Regions:
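Extended, Lys/Arg-rich, non-catalytic nucleic-acid recognition/anchoring regions
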Residues: 1-220
């Protein structure tokens, strides 16, 4: 098994019980940062676990506030982070962001991680910062949406209900028209000093694998 570079449980900074507009209680999970995008499926599973805990505790589902436009806040925040702070593993559509925030049974919150503020969605009632929340955005972008198809398999395996709406997402969007475009984009994002051994999906390309496995002789 290949290594996972996110520790989702350590990435949780706080768990709260908060109030919906109708007075019902819901569960809010605050994600810390910074976090890397590798292991996005595992980071998204954190919210599946949180939803299971919510059901056991008898809490209501999270209801996104329309009067505060919490869905619009996530769209603006993610695009600012993408433009000013750091890139994501996948590019996703605005409509997918809105669909996820509108249907999440638990609140995806987070601490601010970068000195960039939203412009149109400041001073919101249930969001305590105007700055971008990198950890929460990575769970949303590269976990819930970018790996929605893999997540649906986990949901089926765990026999969970209430997450069927993930099947309506378009998921990760391929931005390159051909392999040359995709390769050029990856090369632009390579950190100076890092060697490039092979491009993804290259037939016969060199790839490092970490961890214990019989075929490497490190199975003890």
């Amino acid at each position: 098994r290949q290594g996972v570079t996110i520790a989702p449980l350590q990435g949780i900074s706080e768990v709260k019980i908060k109030k919906n507009k109708d007075g019902t209680d819901y569960l809010s999970v605050s994600i810390a940062g910074p976090m890397r995008s590798a292991g996005g499926t595992e980071s998204a599973v954190t919210l599946l676990i949180a939803d299971h805990v919510r059901k056991i505790a008898g809490l209501s589902k999270f209801q996104a506030n329309s009067f505060d436009d919490e869905t619009g806040r996530f769209v603006e925040e993610l695009r600012i982070y993408e433009r000013e702070a750091s890139s994501f593993q996948f590019h996703i559509l605005d409509e997918d962001i809105e669909h996820v925030i509108s249907n999440l049974p638990v609140e995806l919150a987070g601490v601010d991680t970068d000195p960039y503020e939203v412009v149109n969605h400041k001073g919101m009632t249930r969001i305590q910062t105007d700055r971008v929340r990198g950890g929460a955005l990575r769970v949303l972008n590269d976990g819930l949406i970018g790996r929605s198809k893999k997540l649906l398999k986990r949901i089926e395996m765990y026999n969970l209900d209430g997450w069927e709406w993930l099947g309506d997402l378009k998921g990760a969007v391929q931005t390159g028209d051909n392999q040359e475009d995709a390769a050029a984009k990856r090369m632009r994002e390579v950190i100076t000093g890092r060697s490039v051994l092979s491009m993804p999906n290259k037939l016969g390309g060199f790839r490092l694998r970490y961890g214990r496995a019989c075929n490497t002789g490190f199975a003890a």
